[in-house]
Amino acid sequence: MRKKTAFIFGLGYVGLHLAHQLNLIGWDIVGTSRNPKKISPPGNCTWKILPFDVDSFTNEIEAHLLDSQIIISTIAPIKCNDPVLKQYRNILKQFSGWIGYISATSVYPSQPNRWVDETTVPKPATARGIARWKAEQEWDEVTGAEIFRVA
């Protein structure tokens, strides 16, 4: 039986929590970090942690992407460009598994004293929000990713 592998771009705060929860239900974890030596998987988890350089494609990451069943990206855009799509667009475009993109609520307009939910039309007012909104649209167009907006 083939192992279930989840590939997570960006093992930061959200990525680490996702990795831990997926690992608890039987998924093998491969993830990236700009500084892999700072990541310590909890308990006896044996995660594969790869270095991620926003300006470099690596064959090792490509090989693990091709061996994964799900891919999640938590990496924020840099200068209005998504670094994951910049390097791995062609692989992600052809990926047949499930893809998720973790975005942010900064894509919504300021709504003092009002609820914001998935029916609220995105209208970012900050540079970070605009970059996230652009990245969401690109992930959807290229991969059909499910978009999650976290606060």
Model-derived regions: residue spans:
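Conserved beta-loop-beta element that borders a ligand/cofactor-binding pocket
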Residues: Q137-A151
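NAD(P)H-binding glycine-rich loop region in Rossmannoid oxidoreductase-like domains
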Residues: W47-I91
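N-terminal Rossmann-fold NAD(P) dinucleotide-binding loop
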Residues: G15-L16
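N-terminal Rossmann-fold cofactor-binding loop
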Residues: G31-K37, D53-V54
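Glycine-rich Rossmann-fold phosphate-binding loop(s) that bind the pyrophosphate
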Residues: L11-G12, V150
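Aromatic pocket-lining residues of Rossmann-like dinucleotide-binding sites
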Residues: L22
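Conserved N-terminal Rossmann-fold NAD(P)-binding element of oxidoreductases
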Residues: T5-L11
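Conserved Rossmann-fold NAD(P)-dependent oxidoreductase catalytic core, especially the SDR/UDP-sugar
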Residues: R89-A127
